[in-house]
């Protein structure tokens, strides 16, 4: 039986609760209330873990596993980490998707003794539960990516699911309805760190798919956690509204998604939730659909290894602020599908591209701004420092300077869309003055250190600090007095956290201490330490004054933070303006630096790219002083499919990716790596590129390929762009050719969308003769005897050779192996030529051979019965493939 399934009696019996020490009983009580967490239990200067938690954590953290006494003769496993290094160790636990409960001491040992005597146990309780989706510490989360906590609600007997997301670090929250078939695609876009799901979905296909595809934590909750009445009340209470319509027009499942996420935040943050705006209602169709495999294959925000280097994001990201980097990440994850909105962004990019002089100055100024979104969150959650307030102050100051730069350069002659961006930059004089007058420039990170409030801000602060300074001067006077009395010129008065103030002399001067007022405290190798009643009284007065100052500073700081929070709406608008400026100046910068051009958009099936380049490959070649070979792509209603053949290593895969990436970059509002680009808006991009066995899922290369292809054919629309590379290569040649042929026909006749289809099956090129919207293209090469030169140019025509032996030779295979392979290849070619001519001639002369619509249906009563039980809208691609195998047996 797992801990989570135990009742209180079983739990206490397991750990011998009745004979445990009071401290261990306290630990067990708190642990039982947080069975799904690793419990970090504060013990003095350490956070300690016990029993199973200790064994698990010691392995993850790489720290020693020890023991803390015995319970019924059984040793208690224990490990611990210093309190000041907590964030370092939390990072490792969160990376492994664990949930961690922080249990703090709520009183000092002295306070406990006053309350309950010498044997009193310090009061402790969980002050916060940290999960992958609820962290806000800068060291634990990416500065340039959102950190989403997501609640997924899938109503029974409905085809639409609801998703609510919150990024606690920036206090952003939104809700979206998605078709049930698009759930995984939407989760791929969001890249959530933690997903809340009903326990009823624990063994469902969706839960299984999330665990396999995404590196995130799934937190299961009982079904009642998502109950409509409960969730509606939570929303009304949280936002202090009387009617749910105050949120907007939302469905019941959206209410459940929002309410459940607010409840989870309340449970983990212990009521210390930042101010969250009313959730923004997002239209699913506003964004391009890009499924998980396509995002991975195109390496949009990470490379194939999950790292930033070599990704499109890494190539395009020359932003100078962290919030600008996050906005660019959002843009690339969520390309737009609305022409008006795309053109709005392009117009902003074009303005800055036409005014590069001001772009340089803006980018320099933006470097002086801070991530005020996350500063504001820390302030609202009572986890801030004076430096957060100073960051807001400096940002307000810089924003005003940037606004002045526009006024100085353009006066009133600014386009309205630029005016809208810079309007919030005017600043807030009241807020700026408040922080400027109150917070010291050298404010420490820790409020308990004192010295955060300027002396002149409050008369009592000045008075107490004068007292403290006078006491410190008095200490200096005492030092001089004691030197004269003892005639020890090297005598010092020092301070540490254990002894407080003490008189410090060298051992050789001990015989000069004759007056009994000098009370011995400590002897070390290099010093002997004393105190006096006079010094002790002075220290007590100093400590009391410092305590009063820190207490008053905390009160004043809390009041200042409250006033800052009152300005949170404006500060969030300011943060959005600054991040937008950063991104669009970044677009202008890369357009100028890398010779990008403004794309044009239409509502038809145009796809006219002239001299297009792959941005990532081009950037890599640039470092080696090599040039990228550009290529055109001209898809249209009349020529929707390009069938691309050519040798290995010629650049087919790069060409496929490049056109998909150009589309994505264009639809985020950026200029693109091409001489010109005219694109009919793409609603979905799908790619099937690369092949590898998925051993974890128990899938062969071919099965993985067929599942992806099946999903693409099921989800694409006429406005989609499909990129397919080597479909059918994971099986026998004739099976592969047949599948590839049939897929091409389906795309041409049924989907009628734009498609780039690369293949080594040269037999497919004959399809041009009877698929009017298909055209053959190949990669140009130059042959010189036995050698070939890859020119990387896409040209009209078809290739009948793959030049695989040439690539094998380049890879270093022995010459004897290459020569033998050439002999075998020649024999195979002689055998197959006559067969291929016969088959393909028959295919071109008799279309019905590959046109299943004209064939008579199979008469099979069992098959008919099976078909009647199927709801095509409710089966997954994997289930569809399994049915195909089943039907084949029936036939």
UniProtKB/Swiss-Prot annotation:
GO biological process, one term: mismatch repair
One Pfam family, short name: MutS_IV
GO molecular function: ATP binding; ATP-dependent DNA damage sensor activity; damaged DNA binding; mismatched DNA binding
Entry keyword annotation includes Hydrolase: no
Binding site for ATP: 646-653
Record carries keyword ATP-binding: yes
Keywords assigned: ATP-binding, DNA damage, DNA repair, DNA-binding, Nucleotide-binding
Xref: CDD domains: ABC_MutS1
Family indicated by similarity: Belongs to the DNA mismatch repair MutS family.
HAMAP family: MutS
Purpose of the protein: This protein is involved in the repair of mismatches in DNA. It is possible that it carries out the mismatch recognition step. This protein has a weak ATPase activity.
NCBIfam families tied to this protein: mutS1, PRK05399.1
Name listed for the protein in its UniProt record: DNA mismatch repair protein MutS
Organism whose genome encodes this protein: Rickettsia prowazekii (strain Madrid E)
